Amino acid sequence: VFVSTLTRNSPRSLREAWIALAGLSAVFLFEMLDNSILNVALPTIGRDLHASTTALQWVSNSYAVVFGGLMLVFGAVADRFGRRRVMLAGLVLLGLASLATVFVTSVGELIAVRSLMGVAAAMTTPGSIALAFRLFQGDDLRVRAMTFISTVGLVGLAVGPPLG
């Protein structure tokens, strides 16, 4: 059910669709958390890595620039090679890049890792949204699903800074 379109909206298939949507929403939540959690930590990062204000702006913006620049590209890649496959590869890359942040010793390395995180987010976002859309039939259910996943993403943006 995770990646297939439901052929009917029976109570069981709807329940499975909402469970799958919860998983896809968790992916989106972590992407948005990853995007917003950094901002509170920037002063500490600047001190620890002896980074200039300009370098810290690159730390913050490299993720968004790469993410925005590649999202349409990876949407097309996901259409060609499979949304689930590309999304899962993006999740693996996001996990590895997140782990790599522990080992950075310079601001340049951190910018590179944040850029990799942007690539990973560009891989996961189009697929997760497309898969969420395909879980449901009928405009009403699709609107509810898109509202749910979008709201979860906004929660991630909102709670990221306090968690940072």
Q: Locations of the language-model features?
A:
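Transmembrane-helix bundle of Major Facilitator Superfamily
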Residues: 2-164
